[in-house]
């Protein structure tokens, strides 16, 4: 087996024009694996540390040259000569080299770029696509996409408090059909927004950001577009929300500024339950703040049997925090963001824990993305059956969808599309 002979990092730009880390891992066979890491806008407080330079003279302080230097020096020295197929040992070496709980010494952006690049190099070395290298042989599920078509909150400059309003094409028979369904609804929604005088500019994740009065109005707009595109809401297409509630949770209340409301945890639970009663909502992400575990318990007890409740900020893809959440009975699903935890091995460990505990997993992008399509392969490799990677515009989002099209084609009869079966944990 080949060994690692060089590790090279560089500073590149993400989809928001901010610096991020890209890494090349070279093997003595001449094979090279490359990975670039994403960056979030609304972030959980317990996420692994993304190392920035803080030099206001470069990129307004957001440069990542320190992280790049860590890769090119001490990380490179530590990995030369190692077997790239021993992912667990590679990642453990990186964690020990960093020596902190939050990867604050080397930077999670440095560690993750190397971790994923090693896996890509190893996959190339053994002649397998990444999803097969990590996921093994046999049948595989393509993920049902959560397509973010209307943006609010931290992702938009409008009055909507809920951050993401998404469509899930559960009635499709294949991923290819699901993507077509989403694209047709997206373009229909664009025309409806234009006809109503709303802006059709798109946000960080490719969705529209109309200046609507109430969160409910965004759902109504999506249902109108779904119907006009020729699909049946509640049958062909379901709605998913990302509340990003930590962003508007202050002093023990959920402040929906756009609707002039300040709600207790119980009141906000009832607010969300009413939306679910009135509309075909199948999934709610970050329905409560990461600091409000009691609120999460209320929400889970009320809706957990019939709605997927996804923990993002509250779990930050951290196996230890997820284990505590499972013990306390909060949420029933894990959002998986590889840069929240900062290594491939820890990401896979979190997904495995969720699966063994009866929780679903949703593979996810970040609002600041690159052309790297690793999460598409990870979604298939882990059979998590759901992916969240933006709207039907912006090439940084389409890179993931297009990779999934290729994977479905490569798998042929070994590929399945789960549709509603992705929510196997609901009654």
UniProtKB/Swiss-Prot annotation:
Free-text remark on how the cofactor is bound: Binds a second Mg(2+) ion via substrate during catalysis.
Domain of life: Bacteria
Residues annotated to bind (2R)-2-phosphoglycerate: 163, 337, 366-367, 388
Class in the EC hierarchy, top level: lyase
SMART domains in the cross-refs: Enolase_C, Enolase_N
Catalytic activity field: (2R)-2-phosphoglycerate = phosphoenolpyruvate + H2O
Keyword Electron transport: no
Segments traversing the membrane: none
Protein name per its UniProtKB record: Enolase
Biological source species: Laribacter hongkongensis (strain HLHK9)
């Amino acid at each position: 087996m080949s060994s690692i002979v060089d590790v090279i990092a560089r500073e590149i730009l993400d989809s928001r024009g901010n610096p991020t880390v890209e890494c090349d891992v070279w093997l003595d066979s001449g094979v090279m694996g490359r990975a670039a890491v994403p960056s979030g806008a609304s972030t959980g407080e317990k996420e692994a540390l993304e190392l920035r330079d803080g030099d206001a003279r470069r990129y307004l302080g957001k440069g990542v040259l320190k992280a790049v230097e860590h890769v090119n020096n001490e990380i490179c020295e530590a990995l030369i000569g190692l077997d790239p197929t021993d992912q667990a040992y590679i990642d453990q070496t990186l964690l020990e080299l960093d020596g902190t709980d939050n990867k604050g010494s080397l930077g999670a952006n440095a560690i993750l770029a190397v971790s994923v690049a090693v896996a890509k190099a190893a996959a190339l070395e053994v002649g397998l696509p990444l999803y097969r290298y990590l996921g093994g042989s046999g049948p595989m599920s393509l993920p049902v996409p959560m397509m973010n078509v209307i943006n609010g909150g931290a992702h938009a400059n409008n009055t909507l408090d809920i951050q993401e309003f998404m469509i899930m094409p559960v009635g499709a028979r294949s991923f290819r059909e699901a993507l077509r369904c989403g694209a047709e609804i997206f373009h229909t929604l664009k025309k409806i927004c234009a006809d109503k005088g709303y802006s059709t500019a798109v946000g960080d994740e490719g969705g529209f950001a109309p200046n609507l009065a109430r969160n409910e109005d965004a759902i109504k707009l999506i249902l109108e577009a779904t119907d006009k595109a020729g699909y049946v809401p509640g049958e062909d297409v379901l709605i998913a929300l990302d509340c990003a509630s930590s962003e508007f949770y202050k002093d023990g209340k959920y402040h929906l500024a756009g609707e002039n409301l300040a709600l207790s945890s119980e009141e906000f639970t009832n607010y969300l339950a009413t939306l679910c009663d009135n509309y075909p909502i199948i999934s709610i992400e970050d329905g409560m703040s990461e600091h409000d575990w009691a609120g999460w318990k209320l929400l889970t007890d009320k809706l957990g049997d019939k709605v997927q409740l996804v923990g993002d900020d509250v779990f930050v893809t951290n196996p230890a925090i997820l284990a505590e959440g499972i013990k306390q009975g909060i949420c029933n699903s894990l959002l998986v963001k590889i840069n929240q935890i900062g290594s491939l091995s820890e990401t896979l460990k979190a997904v495995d824990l969720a699966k063994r505990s009866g929780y679903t997993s949703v593979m996810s992008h970040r609002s600041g993305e690159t052309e790297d399509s690793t999460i598409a392969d990870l979604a298939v490799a882990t059979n998590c059956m759901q992916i969240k990677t933006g709207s039907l515009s912006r090439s940084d989002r389409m890179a993931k969808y297009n990779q999934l099209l290729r994977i479905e084609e490569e798998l042929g009869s070994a590929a399945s599309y789960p549709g509603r079966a992705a929510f196997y944990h609901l009654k």
